[in-house]
């Protein structure tokens, strides 16, 4: 479940820290969150798609590591990010 170019650009614009920021941890977490959301809805319809389930778990782990990095750098950035994305963190 990939994101198309316009969705990616919207996420980048919403979460970038400066004008040319396309790969900061905040942007990566936002993209992973969107991909996780799409894949979760796919798995609700296709419950026996085990390879996609494994990919989902890998994405969740990657997002968790990135959130840990952001939290280590700045608690305020972390709390702002999880509030903006609506995730538990």
From Swiss-Prot:
Signal peptide: none annotated. Residues 1-10 have a biased composition (Basic and acidic residues). SMART domains: Ribosomal_S15. One of its GO terms (molecular function) is structural constituent of ribosome. One of the primary rRNA binding proteins, it binds directly to 16S rRNA where it helps nucleate assembly of the platform of the 30S subunit by binding and bridging several RNA helices of the 16S rRNA. Part of the 30S ribosomal subunit. Forms a bridge to the 50S subunit in the 70S ribosome, contacting the 23S rRNA. PANTHER family: RIBOSOMAL PROTEIN S15, BACTERIAL AND ORGANELLAR, SMALL RIBOSOMAL SUBUNIT PROTEIN US15M. This is Small ribosomal subunit protein uS15. It comes from Synechococcus sp. (strain WH7803). The lineage of its organism: Bacteria, Bacillati, Cyanobacteriota, Cyanophyceae, Synechococcales. The gene is rpsO.
